Amino acid sequence: MVLLHWCLLWLLFPLSSRTQKLPTRDEELFQMQIRDKAFFHDSSVIPDGAEISSYLFRDTPKRYFFVVEEDNTPLSVTVTPCDAPLEWKLSLQELPEDRSGEGSGDLEPLEQQKQQIINEEGTELFSYKGNDVEYFISSSSPSGLYQLDLLSTEKDTHFKVYATTTPESDQPYPELPYDPRVDVTSLGRTTVTLAWKPSPTASLLKQPIQYCVVINKEHNFKSLCAVEAKLSADDAFMMAPKPGLDFSPFDFAHFGFPSDNSGKERSFQAKPSPKLGRHVYSRPKVDIQKICIGNKNIFTVSDLKPDTQYYFDVFVVNINSNMSTAYVGTFARTKEEAKQKTVELKDGKITDVFVKRKGAKFLRFAPVSSHQKVTFFIHSCLDAVQIQVRRDGKLLLSQNVEGIQQFQLRGKPKAKYLVRLKGNKKGASMLKILATTRPTKQSFPSLPEDTRIKAFDKLRTCSSATVAWLGTQERNKFCIYKKEVDDNYNEDQKKREQNQCLGPDIRKKSEKVLCKYFHSQNLQKAVTTETIKGLQPGKSYLLDVYVIGHGGHSVKYQSKVVKTRKFC
């Protein structure tokens, strides 16, 4: 196979010029030849035995040429669509009779002879429409000019073309085993184990290969090119082939548009503005994973979601040629999450609940007697937790809970309530929950909207600190505790001590400052202050205030670190 433009030059130069060498598979020589615009003006050529990558604009056809000089030549042409289906056709045209240079007289101008060849229809040898990797293979092809036409009617897309006149010896694509299927050998809630038969390219041909596994939730892929296009879905101009590597400099300048109308119909600029590129080719959210694992033919995919369908593809890649072949992909649905054990709530009793990070817990409340109302008291000890309450399957409540909150819902005779508690992404959650049909029986103390402790900087001394906190209209017992901490006591340590469900019973007696009762009917005056004495100069102290309800349940205010003055 030789390049069209060299063939066309034979039409122009005398017979002696035929001693010029044709482009070969020598990469350095081929790159040097392809840089000359005069040889590659307004057409694309396919080299023998090298895969080319290129780009198609939607509804803008592209044409490639190559010449087979001798009859009975083996020929193989492979077209790989990437991110969109392609329509492509391979045709054969006879070369002009005077191509041998034996004729006498003046030759027609080069452009006119090119146009004469290109305008002829030729004989169609093969056509295909779809997104499969498709082949044209002939063990004995006639000599002539071969023309490959490609079109994408769906969207702008990448594609690859490989052609060779020595298909038996080349074999750049790895071979598949007699059974090319990917099997699912093990299935779990978050893992799937895959296995496939090894490629003969490694075992028989002794060529280096590696396997790449692709996981996604949408569909199976038919080529690694399609996977890479999906993974790198970005500005299409940046993804286009580079001049001198995959197509001629002229093609790069016009980017696939026909020369007679590229500037008129499309008003295309060689360097589009970043704004235009971002507008046309925005980056989509890609939910696909590609993992290359060497030459192993067993692989376990982990970190999957339960009860979710995934598609799995395996590609064998020839490391020498970087060309790949797809196994027959498969799909599988991971197993469902194990059903949660439901905790029974007893009327008027506090239940402690622990919820894992991103986990969930289910609780059931079935009042024995008929009731008009049901009250749920929730005390989230750490971070916020989401609560959902359903009555006989009907959703009544769904919201996040932080601190202490209560919800009163309308009751129904013989109704059953299902409570779902969902942890957050930050970490595990701990909470206390109480359900009752007698809401007058208050087990949790009421809290103000602001549970911070305020320290007065101007009232600090070398041995004391003055603080204040808010109360409510309900008369409650407040206890304040102190603990000496290091000067470098940080937010992480402070956060570990923020479990509001830990009561004063776990504190040392020496840390207790005092307890007192406090309330005010006027919420604007529901503020109390206290001076903690007996502190050491220049030391830091962690202060905690606990409010204790009538049922004995306590809630801790947000901790506060104060530091006494060093010099007084």
UniProtKB/Swiss-Prot annotation:
Keyword terms, alphabetized: Disease variant, Glycoprotein, Hypogonadotropic hypogonadism, Kallmann syndrome, Neurogenesis, Repeat, Secreted, Signal
InterPro entries named in the record: FN3_dom, FN3_sf, Ig-like_fold, NDNF, NDNF_C, NDNF_Fn(III)_1, NDNF_N
GO CC aspect terms: extracellular matrix; extracellular region; extracellular space
Places the protein is found: Secreted
Gene Ontology terms: biological process: angiogenesis; cellular response to fibroblast growth factor stimulus; cellular response to hypoxia; extracellular matrix organization; gonadotrophin-releasing hormone neuronal migration to the hypothalamus; negative regulation of endothelial cell apoptotic process; negative regulation of neuron apoptotic process; neuron migration
UniProt xrefs under SMART domains: FN3
Induction of its expression: Up-regulated by hypoxia (at protein level).
Span of the signal peptide: 1-19
Membrane-spanning intervals of the chain: none
Domain Fibronectin type-III: residue ranges: 261-331, 445-564
Family annotation (Pfam families): NDNF (PF10179), NDNF_C (PF19433), NDNF_N (PF24354)
Main location: secreted
PTM: O-glycosylated; contains heparan sulfate and chondroitin sulfate. N-glycosylated.
Tissue: Expressed in neurons along the gonadotropin-releasing hormone (GnRH) expressing neurons migratory route.
Glycosylation sites: 322
MF terms (GO), sorted A to Z: glycosaminoglycan binding; heparin binding
Disease per UniProt entry: Hypogonadotropic hypogonadism 25 with anosmia: A form of hypogonadotropic hypogonadism, a group of disorders characterized by absent or incomplete sexual maturation by the age of 18 years, in conjunction with low levels of circulating gonadotropins and testosterone, and no other abnormalities of the hypothalamic-pituitary axis. In some cases, it is associated with non-reproductive phenotypes, such as anosmia, cleft palate, and sensorineural hearing loss. Anosmia or hyposmia is related to the absence or hypoplasia of the olfactory bulbs and tracts.
Subunit comment: Binds heparin and chondroitin sulfate.
PANTHER family: NEURON-DERIVED NEUROTROPHIC FACTOR, PROTEIN NDNF
Role: Secretory protein that plays a role in various cellular processes. Acts as a chemorepellent acting on gonadotropin-releasing hormone (GnRH) expressing neurons regulating their migration to the hypothalamus. Also promotes neuron migration, growth and survival as well as neurite outgrowth and is involved in the development of the olfactory system. May also act through the regulation of growth factors activity and downstream signaling. Also regulates extracellular matrix assembly and cell adhesiveness.
Protein name as catalogued: Protein NDNF
Organism whose genome encodes this protein: Homo sapiens
The organism's taxonomic lineage, starting at the top: Eukaryota, Metazoa, Chordata, Craniata, Vertebrata
